[in-house]
């Protein structure tokens, strides 16, 4: 399991906010309590990619959660563009052709993460979407394919982390959304753990959004999460 020199890197704050101004305010309030930020669709479509580049230039790490999935050439060129923004992580959907294209486009310093199954899904959702396998088996199969292709890490729920680690080995990254501090509401996440449980399960990075972004004191919440993982 890869270790970061800075324990704060294990926490990725999800900037699921409506505009860049709100994101800038939150980053300023958190200060040095966090070093790693995720930009997803909502912020990306509101100027968030330029903001991500500025964050990277300021010394922060950025995770572009864009979940690319398209024809190979489009994915490959999209990954090259993300590399130019100074991103640390970029997500693609864990389909073999998509993952191979992403590996071809990967530049220095960028790590590609494959999204296995969204953490808002349970087995009933997967069945409704037409998948024949239960989620645990689907995640394991996609993780194994990702490792064979050369993907840097896997995005999965904490519940599947052990099975994923078995398939990607000790050097692969496991990044987990759906993390909620003790006492926080699960929201639309269906497969959740606390930060301490996630760290004990061998997860490298946890993604936390609303418990931080909606807090009266987001800096303090970020500090507590980092401390909880340190103590696990």
UniProtKB/Swiss-Prot annotation:
EC numbers, comma separated: 4.1.1.23
Annotated binding of substrate, by residue: 16, 38, 65-74, 119, 180, 189, 209-210
An example Gene Ontology molecular-function term: orotidine-5'-phosphate decarboxylase activity
Catalytic activity: orotidine 5'-phosphate + H(+) = UMP + CO2
UniProt keyword Ribosomal protein present: no
Record bears the keyword Zinc-finger: no
Keywords: Decarboxylase, Lyase, Pyrimidine biosynthesis
Pathway entry: Pyrimidine metabolism; UMP biosynthesis via de novo pathway; UMP from orotate: step 2/2
Entry annotation: catalytic residues: 67 (proton donor)
Gene3D superfamilies tied to this protein: Aldolase class I (3.20.20.70)
GO biological processes: 'de novo' pyrimidine nucleobase biosynthetic process; 'de novo' UMP biosynthetic process
TM ranges: none
InterPro entries associated with the record: Aldolase_TIM (IPR013785), OMPdecase (IPR014732), OMPdecase_AS (IPR018089), OMPdecase_bac (IPR047596), OMPdeCOase_dom (IPR001754), RibuloseP-bd_barrel (IPR011060)
Enzyme class: lyase
A cellular component annotation (GO) from this entry: cytosol
HAMAP family for this protein: OMPdecase_type1_B
NCBIfam families named among the record's database cross-references: PRK00230.1, pyrF
Family: Belongs to the OMP decarboxylase family. Type 1 subfamily.
Function: Catalyzes the decarboxylation of orotidine 5'-monophosphate (OMP) to uridine 5'-monophosphate (UMP).
Subunit structure, as described in the record: Homodimer.
Protein name (database record): Orotidine 5'-phosphate decarboxylase
Protein species of origin: Methylorubrum extorquens (strain PA1)
Gene: pyrF
